[in-house]
Regions:
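Extracytoplasmic gate region of multi-pass secondary transporters
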Residues: 1-51, 140
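Intracellular helix-loop hinge segments at the cytoplasmic ends of transmembrane helices
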Residues: 22, 108-116
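Interfacial helix-cap and linker-helix signal at transmembrane-aqueous boundaries
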Residues: 24-25, 56-57, 144-152
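Helix-to-loop junctions at the C-terminal end of transmembrane segments
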Residues: 50-63, 148
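C-terminal transmembrane helical hairpin of 12-TM major facilitator-type secondary transporters
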Residues: 63-109
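Multi-pass alpha-helical transporter architecture, strongest
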Residues: 83-84, 153, 160-182
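A late C-terminal transmembrane helix in Major Facilitator Superfamily
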Residues: 114-151
Length: 182
């Protein structure tokens, strides 16, 4: 279950990292030089998530990982729905930072590896989850070019948004499986 969640996270993370700079040049008409600051805000937000998400899950949600995945899924979906309608650089830049933070759910997923594998097997679990992230990254590279050429820019963001809704559903399923096991 968490491998599917990880794969979706890889599609979202690398889909945004790959296609946002191209979106700025093609859809917003910015040169690479003009759009570079905006494009950098996405990975800066993702880096922040790696520290913020585990902290929030531990301090606010008392070690429960699922509420953070749920919050991240909903905010990422809403951001993906809104992003294609933003037509100027400053709001797009702010949105990219926010999306970078919330789309980067692997900060929570790596913590789940410790929950699932314990001290003995957490590295093995991380390896499996990281493999799934990489497979998601590879899938987006193959599929999103076709999606963009066939359906246009909004379809890429809508696809990522819909995938985060699937991530949300998978999180609820994983939560139910976890409570049944206990």
């Amino acid at each position: 279950m968490f491998c599917l969640i990880s794969a979706i996270a890889g599609i979202g993370r690398y889909g945004l990292l790959t296609w946002v700079p191209t979106y700025f040049t093609e859809a917003l008409g910015l040169s690479i030089k003009d759009g570079i600051f905006s494009s950098i805000l996405l990975p800066v937000g993702q880096a922040c998530a790696m520290f913020v998400f585990p902290l929030i899950t531990d301090k606010v949600f008392k070690g429960k990982r699922e509420p953070m995945l749920i919050l991240a899924s909903v905010i990422t979906f809403l951001g993906m729905v809104c992003f294609p309608f933003i037509k100027s650089q400053l709001p797009a830049s702010i949105m990219l930072f926010v999306l970078g933070v919330f789309a980067m759910v692997t900060g929570v997923i790596w913590a789940i590896a410790g929950d699932l594998g314990g001290r003995a097997f957490s590295s093995t679990i991380v390896g499996g989850l990281d493999w799934a992230v990489c497979m998601g990254a590879a899938m987006q590279a193959v599929v999103f070019g076709f999606v963009k050429d066939t359906f246009g820019w909004p379809a890429i963001f809508a696809t990522i948004g819909c995938l985060y809704i699937i991530l949300l559903v998978l999180t609820f399923v994983a939560r139910k499986m976890k409570t049944k096991r206990i």
